[in-house]
Amino acid sequence: MIPKKTKLKSREIEVPGDKSLSHRSVLFAALSKGKSKVTGFLEAEDPLNTMSAFAKLGLKVQKVKPGEYEFESPGKNKLVSPNVDLDFGNAGTGIRLSAGLICGLPGINATLTGDNSLKKRPMGRIIKPLSSMGASIVGLGEKETAPLKIEGKKLKGFRYESPIASAQVKSCLMLAAISSETDLEYSENILSRDHTENMFRFLGNKIEQISPLHFKIKPPYVLNGGEFRVPGDISSAAFFLVLGVLAKEGNLLIKNIGLNPARTGILTALQSMGAKIEIQNKRIECGETVGDLKTYPSNLKKSNIPESLIPSIIDEIPILSVAGFFAEGGFEIRHAEELRAKESDRIHTMVSNFRELGIEVEEYTDGYSFDGTSKKSSEVWTRLSTVKKIPIQSYMDHRIAMSFLIFKTLSGLDLQIDETSWIETSFPGFEKLLESCINE
């Protein structure tokens, strides 16, 4: 087995606010006439870019203190066309959800763009159903990618059966229907995250739930603003969960984490591998389940990850793969082709980096696998422990960079990650917090 070297300080930590909820708080604040307030807002590049975009549409923004903002909107029907392109940077959630909202606003003309990574990500998955609602939206890049040119108009009611389990597609269409005061019937084959539905209900709206995978919404919609409290992001906590369960000693108590049932797949996956993680102080805040997570040093083993779990762990698969390297029996992920449409092609990026480390990895169209028997893992670790400056490519992807920083900490290997600035898109202060957990 790979020897456990990392000793942690037993301490409480907090991670930044949930990125998904931070984006959505801005969108609902813009839709709602009057004042809204958000605490726990993630002050990272992605949600701040969404905030900046809607400020250009007429949303007034005032920062009260770190993580706390007050918004004032003239109401969705009095938002204005921006005089510059709306730049979402690397925020796929921001551009897709905002596109839906803006499509349903008659008289608003806007071009939504982003960085080179975002311009490669698929937008046809929202363009097609939005167009069926009567939206005027065109992907100006190759293969219907960003920039997105939108001319807002009154949309028609729509029934959509999504071929993929995607909270972004679902939320995009919901926001289009809400902004245009029309009805939407939506169904999917596997349950995706329901943050938009929860925030929508929290504001006083009703959803007709036909089945767990099938719902309807219809006007009139309640859009009077509210006070949102954003919990810590479980996708960010995942890095410290893996650090905690693979440490030689020490316990981490990660406070105030969002435990939405559609997001806790990382807990299910890690616990099925033998991770000891305890949920404490579980409660409901602003329509979302929240709690504290305590980690204990654990011995991990290979576990089969079912297809039904993939949508709820899609962002955590890179760090879960790192845990797999330390697990007896290895690691396999399948039915995860959505990884190829993230900030990078995460199947390719993880496979290529693991191969750079000398790990024999089998790549599939929908995932990858590697053998984690004690002998092979130990041989790889023994060889690498004598190598200096092992190159790791982040591929402009924050989760790849953070995953291999955790790998570096746990393994003690001299990994040289090409660029870590991408981490700022979701987790400012990550490296400093990581260093503070280590007991030298």
UniProtKB/Swiss-Prot annotation:
Keywords: Amino-acid biosynthesis, Aromatic amino acid biosynthesis, Cytoplasm, Transferase. It is an enzyme of class 2 (transferase). Phosphoenolpyruvate binds at K19, G92, R121, Q168, R346, R399. The keyword Cytoplasm applies. SUPFAM superfamilies: EPT/RTPC-like. Pathway: Metabolic intermediate biosynthesis; chorismate biosynthesis; chorismate from D-erythrose 4-phosphate and phosphoenolpyruvate: step 6/7. It comes from the Bacteria. GO terms for biological process: amino acid biosynthetic process; aromatic amino acid family biosynthetic process; chorismate biosynthetic process. One of its GO terms (molecular function) is 3-phosphoshikimate 1-carboxyvinyltransferase activity. Gene3D superfamilies: Enolpyruvate transferase domain (3.65.10.10). It is found in: Cytoplasm. 3-phosphoshikimate binds at K19, S20, R24, S166, Q168, D315, K342. It holds the Pfam family EPSP_synthase. The active site is at D315. Its EC number is 2.5.1.19. GO terms for cellular component: cytoplasm. Its main location: cytoplasm. The keyword Oxidoreductase does not apply. It catalyses: 3-phosphoshikimate + phosphoenolpyruvate = 5-O-(1-carboxyvinyl)-3-phosphoshikimate + phosphate. NCBIfam families: aroA. Monomer. Belongs to the EPSP synthase family. Catalyzes the transfer of the enolpyruvyl moiety of phosphoenolpyruvate (PEP) to the 5-hydroxyl of shikimate-3-phosphate (S3P) to produce enolpyruvyl shikimate-3-phosphate and inorganic phosphate. This is 3-phosphoshikimate 1-carboxyvinyltransferase. It comes from Leptospira interrogans serogroup Icterohaemorrhagiae serovar Lai (strain 56601).
